[in-house]
Amino acid sequence: MEASRSIPPQIPGYTLIKRLGSGSEADVYLYQQLSPARQVAIKISKNTLDPRAAVRFRSEANFMGQISTHPYILSVYENGVTVNGRGYTVFEYAPGGNYKTFLEHGRLTADQMLTVGIDLASALFTAHRKGIIHRDIK
């Protein structure tokens, strides 16, 4: 059953600020965490989770937690299921935005592209060492 993307769920301990983006299986929102007080990004599944999907969603958060000590991988703070059955994962908020938005307003220099490529390769290498394969790199 598809959940409405226009109405993000209420999550206890967090106050919605705005929508940050959307992927094929989840939306990402900026929330204010009440304690400790900080802004966080929350990835929320678009659909209610059947038991198999819930296991995958939880596994993804656990894998992210294992590799989040890497400087280019966001920290995971919490993982759960909303009252209406949608999975969510609370991440560190990186306020810089994404590269797609950046590229819509300008170009990267050769040095910047090289730096991004090296940083991305380093993060992927860290994940691969733990047996994690990212299946949605854009």
Predicted features and spans:
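AlphaC helix of the eukaryotic protein kinase fold
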Residues: K46-I67
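Short beta-strand micro-motifs within the conserved protein kinase catalytic domain, predominantly
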Residues: S75-G87
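Activation segment signature within eukaryotic-like protein kinase domains
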Residues: V116-G117
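Protein kinase catalytic-loop region centered on the HRD/HxD motif
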Residues: S122-I132
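Conserved N-lobe ATP-binding subsite of Hanks-type protein kinase domains
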Residues: D27
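Flexible N-lobe loop architecture of eukaryotic-like protein kinase catalytic domains
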Residues: G21, S59, S68-Y72, V83
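Conserved short submotifs of the Hanks-type protein kinase catalytic core
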Residues: N84-N98, F102
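Conserved N-lobe loop of protein kinases adjacent to the ATP-binding glycine-rich P-loop
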Residues: Q32-Q39
